[in-house]
A protein has these predicted regions:
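Membrane-embedded helix bundles of polyisoprenyl
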Residues: 29-36, 70-78, 120-139, 144-193, ...
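Alpha-helical transmembrane segments at the extracellular/periplasmic loop-to-helix junctions
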Residues: 271-288, 302-386
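Extracytoplasmic
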Residues: 2-9, 108, 125-131, 434-697
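Loop-to-helix entry region of an early transmembrane alpha helix in multi-pass inner-membrane enzymes
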Residues: 84-96, 107-131, 164-168, 172
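Hydrophobic/aromatic-rich transmembrane helices and adjacent perimembrane loops
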Residues: 387-390, 395-434, 440-443, 456, ...
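Membrane-interface helix-loop-helix junctions at transmembrane boundaries of multi-pass membrane enzymes
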Residues: 15-17, 195-196, 239-245, 294-303, ...
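Start-transfer (signal-anchor) and selected internal transmembrane alpha helices
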Residues: 1-41, 50, 133, 147, ...
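Transmembrane signal-anchor helices characteristic of membrane glycosylation enzymes that use polyprenol
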Residues: 16-52, 57-58, 64-70, 74, ...
């Protein structure tokens, strides 16, 4: 053992003590960075967020099929039915690197799965970024600043949130590559660097920039930052031939490789503004180089001004001729945040929102103030590298304010600034502790030696200023993976689980056919493809905004108009995510807004003024005090064919597909549907899966052999039940319903044989409307009601006789009117009327018979001849009857 210790001491004796301490500190920083990013492991070993599931699929594909196969991969799982050309729609840097890491581990005997590699990959990338930031800080301000930069970056909340366990997105590799680009390019331009060294570092910068471009769409930022930096150096009189050489070598390599090696960008990227500035600044460099051969500074300034004007004019011409492509989409919204108001698909994503000063302080805490002090120190020195750091800080600060997710690109320069401030503010304290102040031999009145306790106090204040930022770092890391809480933004308490999406995806995987197509909002596309292994209409790439608008339409239309659209897309299942809570004393639950209950507003905005076929759908919002109401308008051409209220307040009505699914799923509504059958409900009722049914349209017919029969005669009823194309339904039963004199009742249930049914019936008297009712078969055929078969059954005839007790009476004398039916009936009504001219009649009374008879006593109030007649209304199977007219004479 002693010999081994001596051997180790001998081996390390050649290492300078300062260098050894530096390596030790960097190792500790690396371990701290790994440990902090591993904190989410408490909640499970998952990929986090949404995009990492795409990277996992791509990594797995590369491992199984090889790197070159990826460039020919047409993925049929996404954007059904069109699919996606993966090389044209995605960047491959992260997936290729993760696949290479997997292959390397297997080559050295580490038998890890692809999933294990991709879950752990981000934390390694984040830790390596901290080490890279050490070299950046060291090159800019020395070793002390480098070590602090590494520590600040290791514990930076913005960086942690994007490089934590399972967060396999572009940022896990992108920030590391961006920092390396800065290191290589700045080293290429270090004073005293040989041309060979300059070219070497420039080539490394160009290769790394190409690698970043194949990895992260935000590669435009470091690219254009370097271009801007070079332009500023030229315009401020800091031009050197070394700068021209490094610029030419860096972008020569980059422009040669990128159009060929990144299919998503292709050669078309060369006409974009971000790339056209590269040759523009190259011309500026050449003009400045040519100016060095001019005799005076005035001539050089004129040459540079002319070159600048020519470049501006050329850029204007390229824009007018539409040769230059200006930024669009989320890139435009980053440059100009106001344009996102017209981009609902961009604005609907929470990480695309503008940042606030509160969010900056939340991310950087007390380092915010140290960063401001660091800015003061670099402005006071203002070397070339300080100009680069200034430009990097200002531009990243602007973009971070424009897009909250881009606070990440602010992390490296801000960490460097905070490190510089800490070093510069700690220097006096260290000098005091070391007693490094040299006092003159001659005593100077008033000069007092400062004790070491003042140095300790300064260092303690700096530590107190830094520690709060580190505590926020732990809080940023100590959060579960998105899918572990079903994307609900909370940390579950002990014993509480919100794994509704994991349950739903497992159910879809195990209980639906492999060919099933699942319609869901685009947020969940990557989850459904990766974990449920099923096709989706859209995913988080949002590459086809037209199809996303169609999904929004299908969710916001009523089922009658949505089902034909779903059938066109061959939708098998629909999955919705709705968050709610039940409060004691409330009859209905309250929506929380973390699922579609908060996203349907964006569906309305995205679907608004979009068309399907000849139909255009529009949505209108009306506000009355605190109440917000949405209306859905459907137009064909200029004609409004439907105008319905779809919501009152936060809650959607049942007359939209999403409203029906949400309301029935959480128990607000008891509505039913022929098209949607809820087949899965997660444990917390947050994720609902509906099977989409496409029942055949049913056509039922009915007819009778006679439309007019006498009472007691039999009627033969026949009919058919077929689909809309005339194909008969083989078996089943048909309910026959009769509506007689406005009263509906069932006649019988007839059996269906090869699409036909028949029934013999003796109908009661009256006017009949007979219909056939097919109840349908769930998910296969729709219910149907036939057009009515009309029929009249003549009632049993009866006669009515009328007589008077006296036909000649005196005024004031009573007379008895006697009525007799040929049938002894006690239902129906008698009506007795009289007339003085046998034309205009006055009703005397209406009364029911008793056993077919009535004796009515009447005292006339006028003299002369009175004509008297009675009628019977008829009842049941007996018809009406009218008596003859009798005449009575009343004397004065």
């Amino acid at each position: 053992m002693a010999s081994r210790i001596r051997a180790i001491r001998k081996a390390t004796s050649g290492i300078p003590r300062g260098g050894f301490l530096e390596i030790l500190i960097l190792s500790l920083v690396f371990v701290i960075a790994l440990a902090v990013r591993l904190l989410p492991l408490r909640f499970g070993f998952y990929l986090s967020e949404f995009d990492p599931y795409l990277q996992w699929r791509m990594t797995d594909y590369v491992v199984k099929n090889g790197f070159l196969a990826w460039f020919n991969w047409h993925d049929v799982m996404s954007w059904y039915p069109w699919g996606m050309n993966m090389a044209q729609g995605n960047l491959y840097g992260v997936a290729f690197t993760a696949a290479a890491a997997y292959m390397f581990l297997h080559a050295i005997g580490v038998q890890a799965t692809v999933f294990e590699v991709v879950v752990l990959f981000p934390i390694v990338g984040g830790a390596l970024t901290s080490i890279a930031c050490y070299f950046l800080g060291k090159d800019l301000w020395g070793r002390g600043a480098g070590l602090l930069t590494a520590l600040f970056m290791a514990l930076n909340p913005s960086n942690i949130s994007r490089t934590t366990l399972g967060f396999l997105r572009h940022e896990a590799l992108g920030i590391l590559l961006m920092v390396l680009i800065f290191i290589f390019f700045l080293r290429a331009n270090q004073k005293g660097r040989s041309p060979r060294g300059t070219i070497t570092y420039s080539i490394l910068a160009g290769l790394t920039l190409f690698y970043l471009t194949a990895t992260w769409a935000a590669s435009y930022y470091p690219l254009d930052l370097i271009v801007l930096y070079v332009a500023v150096l030229v315009l401020t009189g800091r031009y050197t031939r070394q700068l021209l050489l490094s610029y030419a070598a860096t972008f020569g390599v980059f422009l040669f490789l990128t159009p060929l090696g990144v299919p998503k960008l292709g050669f078309g990227v060369l006409s974009t503004l971000s790339f056209l500035v590269i040759p523009g600044v190259a011309l500026l460099l050449l003009a400045r180089e040519a100016g060095t051969r001019l005799p005076t500074w005035r001539h050089r300034a004129y040459a540079l001004a002319i070159a600048s004007v020519v470049l501006v004019g050329l850029a204007y011409a390229l824009v007018e001729l539409k040769v230059m492509q200006l930024p669009s989409g989320k890139f435009l919204s980053t440059l100009n945040p106001f344009t996102r108001l017209d981009m609902p698909i961009v604005e609907s994503v929470s990480e695309h929102r503008p940042a606030t000063w509160a969010s900056f302080f939340y991310e950087y805490s007390t380092l915010t103030f140290l960063g401001l002090f660091g800015f003061f120190f670099i402005l006071r020195r203002l070397r070339d590298t300080d100009i680069f750091l200034t430009l990097g800080t200002l531009t990243s600060l602007y973009f971070a304010g424009s897009l909250v997710r881009l606070t990440l690109i602010l992390a490296p320069p801000f960490s460097v600034l905070a490190a510089i401030a800490t070093v510069e503010m700690a220097k006096p304290a260290v000098d005091i502790l070391r007693q490094a102040v040299i006092f003159p031999k001659r005593r100077i009145p008033g000069l007092v030696r400062i004790g070491r306790e003042f140095g300790l106090a300064i260092l303690l204040i700096l530590v107190i200023a830094i520690v709060p930022a580190f505590s926020r770092a732990v809080a940023a890391a100590y959060a579960p993976a998105t899918i572990a809480t079903s994307s609900i933004p909370l940390i579950p308490s002990e014993g509480t689980k919100y794994q509704d999406w994991l349950e739903a995806l497992a159910w879809i995987h195990d209980n639906t056919p492999d060919s099933a197509v699942v319609m869901a909002w685009w947020d969940y596309g990557y989850w459904i493809m990766a974990l449920a292994d099923r096709k989706t209409l859209a995913d988080n790439g949002t590459g086809n905004t037209t199809q996303i608008a169609m999904i929004a339409q299908m969710f916001m239309r009523n089922e009658t108009t949505a089902i034909p659209m779903m059938q066109r897309y061959n939708v098998s299942y629909a999955a919705v995510f709705v968050t709610y809570a039940r409060t004691q004393g409330q009859s209905n639950p309250s929506f929380l807004g973390a699922g579609e209950d908060g996203k349907w507003y964006w569906m309305v905005r995205i679907a608004n003024q979009t068309s399907y076929g000849n139909q255009t759908i529009l949505f209108q919002e009306r506000r009355a005090q605190e109440q917000v109401t949405y209306y859905r308008i459907l137009k064909i051409g200029d004609k409004v064919v439907a105008n319905e209220t779809i919501s009152s307040g936060q809650q959607l009505n049942d007359n939209s597909v999403l409203g029906f699914m949400m309301n029935t799923g959480v128990g607000i509504s008891g509505a039913t549907s022929d098209y949607f059958d809820r087949v899965f409900t997660s444990s917390n009722n947050f994720v609902l899966v509906y099977k989409v049914l496409y029942p055949k349209t049913t056509v039922a017919t009915i007819s009778v052999d006679k439309n007019r029969v006498k009472y007691g005669e039999s009627v033969h009823i026949t009919g058919t039940v077929t689909d809309s194309e005339g194909n008969p339904y083989k078996t089943g039963t048909v309910r026959l319903e009769d509506s007689v004199n406005g009263e509906a009742k069932d006649i019988a249930v007839a059996d269906l044989a090869d699409g036909k049914f028949s029934y013999d019936w003796k109908p009661p008297a009256g006017n009949h409307s007979v219909t056939a009712h097919w109840s349908g078969v769930g998910g296969e055929t729709r219910s149907a009601v036939s057009s009515p078969a009309l029929m009249f059954v003549e009632p049993i005839p009866v006669t009515l006789a009328i007589s008077l007790s006296s036909y000649n009476i005196t005024l004031g004398q009573n007379v008895t009117v006697s009525l007799r039916l040929t049938e002894k009936l006690s239902n129906g009504t008698f009506t007795i009327r009289y007339s003085i001219d046998n034309k205009t009649w006055t009703v005397l009374t209406t009364v029911s018979p008793e056993n077919g008879a009535l004796d009515y006593s009447w005292r006339p109030d006028r003299v002369g001849a009175l004509y008297i007649q009675a009628s019977y209304s008829g009842a049941g199977d007996f018809g009406p009857a009218t008596s003859g007219v009798v005449v009575m004479y009343v004397k004065p």
